[in-house]
């Protein structure tokens, strides 16, 4: 084990030097294989493709190898751990300096004659053919690793890899006899006598018979027959199998470019686009393999070969490839190192075809960064990490530099491959549909197939002649510009290759070939012919120079002066030299022939590229026409969507402006709110949204009828959701009157529950007609009062009936005896039913209308009330009088509510309710939660009057409640605090005040207030003075939650209304806070308009925006505010931020601040919370729009 670890560390160090070759079945570092050649010699011509069905060829190959194997034992050859290995001649060998290149060629050149060492130097342009190393007697030559090498018949070019075999310089390690590995690989080169002037090379992989038992031999035979039956363009073609007394031999196709691992070691990392192209081809081949019930189980870069035209071929399947019916000892066996193996195989668990999906991920990582996962660990450590379910492959196996090489789509693709559980891992068909493959294969898939078919095959070692067509359909790319640039690059490469060929002269220079002659006459005749040749090709000025050159390069030989033995030796030397020259001339002619063949290839590639561009233009024309139709359709759909959006906005506006008369209308509004998918965070702080029990309907809690829901608050709406994930509310309650909110508690046998009772008053539309505010009938009904009338829904219509149209009434009045109806005319009310409470109707003449046409003046009750008021004014102070008025009103509200409940039980079907109250009960387990919710609900309900088209109580009762303590200026029209109109006389008060509620600062527009201040002031003076006082007392406990004395708040309000300056030094901070909230609630206009509120909610709920983008959008939104509104919002948020900073930061502090000021300023809670947290960034110094 220590030796293996030491060897692996050595392999890893060599990998860092870019000498790493991914291992084969064993998973170890690979070295060049022992290469044995079986050759026969002949003059090579242009080879052609071999028919796949040529059985004679297979027999010749097998017979040739059998002859070799009979004479040579496989034991004498060193074993290697790779199935197939060969060294490829790179451009670096042929780009050496002239001297080194000449030395390299001399090293590779075989001896041409016995005394070749004494021969003259040859030209540097001469190249050599592999036929020089072939035996002339057609004998089989065995070439060991250090004995002989062969030269490529083609000079390597930048466009393709050659099949040259160079002498290996690496060591060969002994490998243990492991099943699934080959002892050696031999190359069979067949020539004329087999293939009719064609040279083809076939690799044969040999396995020693002593290493495998009889069971394994049968398995190998059966599986080879299965592999031989596979016919696919992405799988290596297996030709035959040799089985004799020495062992097994497998004959397959030969590919001169080698494996992807060899290419990585030669050229470096692959580009992602090229990896995607190869991955697509491999997945298509694996899809075919899996459809045949076969699992590869040994997929890695060393087992993927590259053919001409960029086509990859899968080879070297692991033993036990069948999905079933395999012996367990083989099926669950481990092949080599675990770096490429899936967790289920390493755990020896049952596996399926998804083990190849794991190997695909390892292969992609290997092609891009040069190593599989966990290659920096030892084998056992890597096995543990792969099996460990908590360990992730990405990005643990990559450093920071390597992670930058992987795109986002590729990372997603690899995550699907590296799922530890096979059920979660993507199959081959799932990976084929991944967008990462379509990114790089859309535009190149169709072109690559056409170009590969159009290229002529100069030397084809691919026996699979018919290339199967792509299983995928034709892909089209709309990126015409990238196609155009790619075509230009390819054409420039082809033309540059053509220029290089043109620069190489195809004519043979005879001056390089020096032949010796026998006598002087022949030499002179040769000189004469040679001079004529030069005169025809050169200028006349160079004639003498050429003669001198020729004279210097030749020598006169006089054989008569020598002895006979010397003449014989001299003639032998001349013959040897002339033979050498003849060989050089032959090689030069072969090189010229090869250059012409390459030129022919370039012409054919130009032709195929022209056809490809033509097809691209046709496709582009079709796509352009289709794009135009799609563009028209898209524009039409955009216009339709625009119109629908405008209709939707108008409907939303109509729904907002519509008078809501029933609770189902409130649900419609909730639907509009949640149609924009507003989250809970933008609705309200999460601390104000909780699970609770509620009931709707009765004002009393009924056991067993409660519902559990998730409640949250939005403006004046209380939404109930089934759970936190629900997107549509199940119930909606509208809060429109603070008098309808009360608290109570109930006690049962188990525990005590705290109840909040909320009443929503819904009125008839005719009673809220704003056009008849001055002369309409005023209703002083309580929240639960019911008005019973005839079939006429409007009480005003019943009061305007003619006096002569009197009907008989059968009424049983069990209601309040103090109900007063006053009218100016002799109007009779018509009713059929049991009237329990009739709303009082005020008429100036002070007469009472009774049933049965009897009209009497009511003097005694009024006189008694006036006397009581006078006595009370004399005995008690004004403050006590106000308190008693409040108590009386509360008692009347309770009586009216009781009367309304009894009236609801006694109503007939013919009676119409002009107003009704919907009750909602919220139940809490403890008083603290109840108090928190009660405070929030109390702050949400507005104190100001609603407009006529909003859900609201009638205007008069609310004004009475708000201004009943204000004395009327009309002394002749005094009324009791409990009577209609209150102490203030609302009608006369409105006339004298001109319709303005407050004459001072409360209830006045901010723009009007700022006109009274200096131009440089940001806030009104009284407001800035109030905020400075509160900032000094911000540490006061409960400054936002607790409310000060209502009497003190009212006194400070009256001082402000009179224009007096208030000294807040000795004032209660809680009362000053209440005054501040009162001022903000009474503002006639909202600080943030409705459309800006909607925009802010959409910005904050948009998940695509980051923090900076949201701040930028909010700044743009706030810039639309006027200067007074912007300053008020800025200073109020600064004060709220100061409260949060001075307190111990927690969710409850910011929740209290939000619930205090967000409803008061009428700003969405989510926006308020966001502005507090980002105050410094949201309020920079910039010019605001006026």
UniProtKB/Swiss-Prot annotation:
PROSITE patterns, A to Z: PROTEIN_KINASE_DOM, RHOGAP
UniProt-listed GO biological process terms: intracellular signal transduction
Site (Arginine finger): 1041
Protein kinase domain ranges (all copies): 173-437
Residues given in the record as ATP binding sites: 179-187, 205
Alphabetic keyword roster: ATP-binding, Coiled coil, GTPase activation, Nucleotide-binding
Region named Disordered: 1-55, 99-122, 447-468, 530-551, 766-911, 959-988
Biased composition (Acidic residues): 1-12
GO molecular function term, any single one: protein serine/threonine kinase activity
Coiled-coil residues: 631-659, 875-909
Superkingdom, taxonomy of origin: Eukaryota
Gene3D superfamilies: Rho GTPase activation protein (1.10.555.10), Transferase(Phosphotransferase) domain 1 (1.10.510.10)
Polar residues: compositionally biased ranges: 453-468, 766-784, 969-978
Domain Rho-GAP positions: 1004-1186
Chain intervals with Low complexity compositional bias: 34-48, 99-110, 530-545, 785-836, 897-911
Amino acid composition bias (Basic and acidic residues), ranges on this chain: 847-896
Protein family according to the UniProt entry: Belongs to the protein kinase superfamily. STE Ser/Thr protein kinase family.
Protein name in the entry: Probable inactive serine/threonine-protein kinase DDB_G0293184
Organism of derivation: Dictyostelium discoideum
Lineage, broadest ranks: Eukaryota, Amoebozoa, Evosea, Eumycetozoa, Dictyostelia
